[in-house]
Amino acid sequence: MEIKDQGAQMEPLLPTRNDEEAVVDRGGTRSILKTHFEKEDLEGHRTLFIGVHVPLGGRKSHRRHRHRGHKHRKRDRERDSGLEDGRESPSFDTPSQRVQFILGTEDDDEEHIPHDLFTELDEICWREGEDAEWRETARWLKFEEDVEDGGERWSKPYVATLSLHSLFELRSCILNGTVLLDMHANTLEEIADMVLDQQVSSGQLNEDVRHRVHEALMKQHHHQNQKKLTNRIPIVRSFADIGKKQSEPNSMDKNAGQVVSPQSAPACVENKNDVSRENSTVDFSKGLGGQQKGHTSPCGMKQRHEKGPPHQQEREVDLHFMKKIPPGAEASNILVGELEFLDRTVVAFVRLSPAVLLQGLAEVPIPTRFLFILLGPLGKGQQYHEIGRSIATLMTDEVFHDVAYKAKDRNDLVSGIDEFLDQVTVLPPGEWDPSIRIEPPKNVPSQEKRKIPAVPNGTAAHGEAEPHGGHSGPELQRTGRIFGGLILDIKRKAPYFWSDFRDAFSLQCLASFLFLYCACMSPVITFGGLLGEATEGRISAIESLFGASMTGIAYSLFGGQPLTILGSTGPVLVFEKILFKFCKEYGLSYLSLRASIGLWTATLCIILVATDASSLVCYITRFTEEAFASLICIIFIYEALEKLFELSEAYPINMHNDLELLTQYSCNCVEPHNPSNGTLKEWRESNISASDIIWENLTVSECKSLHGEYVGRACGHDHPYVPDVLFWSVILFFSTVTLSATLKQFKTSRYFPTKVRSIVSDFAVFLTILCMVLIDYAIGIPSPKLQVPSVFKPTRDDRGWFVTPLGPNPWWTVIAAIIPALLCTILIFMDQQITAVIINRKEHKLKKGCGYHLDLLMVAVMLGVCSIMGLPWFVAATVLSITHVNSLKLESECSAPGEQPKFLGIREQRVTGLMIFILMGSSVFMTSILKFIPMPVLYGVFLYMGASSLKGIQFFDRIKLFWMPAKHQPDFIYLRHVPLRKVHLFTIIQMSCLGLLWIIKVSRAAIVFPMMVLALVFVRKLMDLLFTKRELSWLDDLMPESKKKKLEDAEKEEEQSMLAMEDEGTVQLPLEGHYRDDPSVINISDEMSKTALWRNLLITADNSKDKESSFPSKSSPS
């Protein structure tokens, strides 16, 4: 029988819908196992056609047609025509061209818009003395999962490996079997009737066995998650199962342990001719042992026998698996099996329109869109199983999945299979064991190239133009108006202001806030302490806390990028030391001159905002970003270790002790033998007489304050030896680093449910600090603790909270202050904007935009306020900001088993930064709690933050390549396009710049550090002489050029022309002139027909047809 004749006979069997409203999920009545689902249980799984994706890579959105009246007329014309679907595709040279044409078409309704698919493979099974049933043996959401041989558990998800023979057989099934597209049916019984009627009318099925096949299709379906009512709660449950129940969403908690009742299952509108499945009288043969080796029959799996009439049985929904199914997903059911009364295969591929919820058919209660039925004679169970796996795997393929939705006839489906065969990779049988399960990859390659037509040689593919500057968005365009960039920043950020507070209602934000509060407190207090030593207490810890709190609150509320965390920086401390030394030498008021410099710096920064100077950020490329960020991370690690080593001075260890003399160990305070002149002067001023002091009774701190000396075997040079404290501090330090890293990676571990792992990972650092504090308190060793000021007042009594810019200084100092203010302006600008550039990287997928001008304005204003109040200056802190961003990463909650969660972006909000600095300002009143936090724990947090911030920096990946043989090097994209020697040269230059920055940072010349960071931009420009433009495009961002605007305008015009063609419904394919004349293009369909394997399959199909022609039939094919 010809395929065209077969298609002509299908047309009368395709009823058309008369309603023109939105498609409603009507459910079905064929199932005896009715299921009642609570509304909140299935929320998100019953709503269809709300958010859909369009498979064509070049199109961004789907055009919705408002003129629905045309559908009736179009369908009437299609029904009157003799075509199978009323739509014909032109002929093409290759299957890829046909598939690209299919995916490029648009339909007038939403029935052909692809949805996510859940595919289930059921095989018919029977046991002696029991009724037959369909048993679930495998399922696909993204990767394949099989029911293990014992029948009690699912296998781990794995990449399906298919035999080429089964793919050829599947192609033959689609080519010769029954294909019914856009069938309108409401129950499984109606579907079976239409399929079998078509089979009988086309001569593929004998009328005598039609009824028995129908009864086989109506048999009960048993799914892996079904359990008996009496055994729903086993006596012994694993902790993982208990945790799983606790980790379900609140909307599902109350129903998670309940079995749904059958009273309110969705009823079908047409409930007619209901034939009960349990009364079926199909006599299956006992000879199903003809299964081939290598495939375990579903009947061989351990079964849970469910006794009693079906109306007493109730289904349990696997809510944990339901969470992994995307909203709007549809089902694809594969039914395969052996029947003793058949002597040839029965094959049908059905696409329902609309999708219908068929009760009991699928494991999860979602509408069914596709059915594939393959029933055949005994002895070929393994063959049918592999064909079922093949079609199921094809349905999970991104391209064939879209073809199945948009196919107009069987030829489209065959083209989809051929295109799939054109892309598959074949493994040699002698070098690979097919029984080995391949682990799912971490990153699945994109399939967009398969959907978009190829282009002739010499032309650039659309969307693959060479990249330009990495920071060339609209927020960095010069406006040419005073404060033009600032106005645009405000307009860009204002619509998101309230959402910045709403989006913070998440446990992740709470975890981020608690972690970063502890991380920000210590450097602020430490910086204040160092500043107090450098300025003789004029600016100390309490001023640092107050300034950080006030500046941070204002910035978090009104800044352009609230993800940035403000903090103190090393160059600012160096500047403060130099300024104080200068004022002391020349008898000037330090706070007054500092206020003048701060006001000039704020004014200059505001001028930079007014002139859109932040647009210069586009010259800061990855080369400069990574050198700066790497330096800050290394400094964090270095200072954490340095602070740990400094503890050995305060808590020395006796390295030469004698265990035999421990009983004689003592350390006493005695009067100094030769007191210095300074000591004698201090005693006279305090009216202290050395002879009146009982030196032996003094404590360590009292002895130190009176300049006494320590005598005894247990004494060091300046202090008594302190047992255990240093070693205990080292233990706390490294335990904090290790536990923080371990708990942060807990999200990817194998233990506990997903929700538990996610919470532990989010609160990793806070839980670590809490654990270390409790352990330290329980052990009782007097480790150094965090010291927080307990009184809110200036450190010195001779200063207040406000400072006049002039004060006792000469009037000309106010004008002269502009000179150091210029240097401070460069320092503030570079620190702020480089950190902002790192936070606003495209890979962070920020959706609310950035505000470089608004950020700089807020920093400038608060710098002026802090100057008048005599408080430290604060600017963007690189490592704290990167840590803040990393703690707020969003990943997809709905991911298929075996699929890695997708990075969705950052939870952009203002609340975490706001709460950090509010609590920081309140720390004065929390001294009784904060005094229990050991300083080594905070040093360990610093080391963890510095090390974790290094992840993702390409510079360190390239450093590793120096000691790595080429065959072991990772598959970095730049290694594919840039010679290795050029990669090494680029890295060496970057390392040299980093080394120079480090030398300047730790030396007395640290004041010029911002100038050296600025010099990196010029170094990067000179690298254009050593590298080609193409090489730099892979290793670094290209520098902005004068031609960039013209190139962007040309790209915009090209995009507009492409959109215009799409609106006209035109899809241009290079069908002539390229493919036909290119001898390298192979048509896999033609080549397949020449293979001996395909010819053998055709001979088998022809013999079956000849045999079928001898069957008596009530209706012959036309």
Curated annotation (Swiss-Prot):
Annotated region (Disordered), positions in chain: 1-23, 58-96, 245-312, 457-476
Recorded GO CC terms: apical dendrite; apical plasma membrane; axon terminus; basal dendrite; basolateral plasma membrane; CA3 pyramidal cell dendrite; dendrite; GABA-ergic synapse
Stated consequence of mutating N687Q: Reduced glycosylation. Abolishes glycosylation
Residue intervals annotated with topology Cytoplasmic: 1-509, 560-562, 618-626, 742-762, 831-855, 934-935, 1020-1118
GO biological process: bicarbonate transport; brain morphogenesis; chloride transport; locomotory exploration behavior; multicellular organism growth; post-embryonic development; proton transmembrane transport; pyramidal neuron development
Ranges of Polar residues composition bias in the record: 248-264
Impact reported for Y721C: In NEDHBA; likely pathogenic; affects function in cellular pH regulation; no effect on localization to cell membrane
SUPFAM superfamilies listed in its UniProt record: Phoshotransferase/anion transport protein
Glycosylation sites noted in the Swiss-Prot or TrEMBL record: N674, N677, N687, N697
Compositional bias ranges of the Basic and acidic residues kind: 77-90
Matching InterPro entries: Band3_cytoplasmic_dom, HCO3_transpt-like_TM_dom, HCO3_transpt_euk, Na/HCO3_transpt, PTrfase/Anion_transptr
NCBIfam families (alphabetical): ae (TIGR00834)
PANTHER family documented for this protein: ANION EXCHANGE PROTEIN (PTHR11453), SODIUM-DRIVEN CHLORIDE BICARBONATE EXCHANGER (PTHR11453:SF32)
Disorder association: Neurodevelopmental disorder with hypotonia and characteristic brain abnormalities: An autosomal recessive disorder characterized by hypotonia in infancy, delayed psychomotor development and intellectual impairment. Affected individuals commonly display traits associated with autistic spectrum disorder including anxiety, hyperactivity and stereotyped movements. Episodes of seizures in the first few years of life may occur. Brain imaging shows abnormalities of the lateral ventricles.
Name recorded for this polypeptide: Sodium-driven chloride bicarbonate exchanger
The organism's taxonomic lineage, starting at the top: Eukaryota, Metazoa, Chordata, Craniata, Vertebrata
Gene name of this polypeptide: SLC4A10
